[in-house]
């Protein structure tokens, strides 16, 4: 995994981040009930594999994030497994893998939070979409 560098705080970074967080709180409040996330098309990635944090991913929102940044449409919702289901712990946004740090900084100030890029990911040979996200998949 590669992390973006930390930038010095620029004028307006805090205000910009606060505006994003204020909108994100609407999303956070909505998806405290993980059933609503499932109803809205989020799917649990690898639900049968024990994890520290479970990613409820939205392929539609991920694809949308390749061209626009919409705080109300996070690519993934992050949940902790609890005795009666899942407890919302955070939200995650995506950007194109080829974005520069300047482009990422336009989405959210790098002075306040880093972005990360997954590198050296092992994927199965063949049709990635069908292998990773088969039509009858319970996740992905």
Give residue ranges: language-model regions.
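Primary mode marks residue(s) on the alpha4-beta5-alpha5 output face of response regulator receiver
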Residues: 1-140
């Amino acid at each position: 995994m590669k992390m973006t560098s930390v930038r010095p705080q620029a004028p307006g970074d805090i205000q910009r981040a606060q505006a994003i967080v204020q909108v994100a709180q609407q999303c956070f409040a909505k998806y405290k009930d993980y059933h609503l996330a499932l109803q809205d098309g989020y799917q649990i990635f690898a639900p049968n594999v024990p994890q520290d944090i479970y990613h409820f991913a939205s392929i539609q929102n991920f694809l949308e994030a390749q061209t626009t940044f919409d705080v109300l449409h996070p690519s993934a919702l992050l949940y902790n497994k609890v005795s009666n289901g899942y407890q919302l712990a955070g939200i995650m946004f995506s950007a194109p893998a080829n974005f520069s740090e300047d482009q990422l900084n336009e989405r959210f100030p790098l002075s306040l939070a880093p972005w990360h890029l997954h590198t050296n990911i092992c994927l199965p040979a063949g049709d990635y979409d069908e292998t990773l996200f088969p039509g009858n998949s319970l996740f992905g």
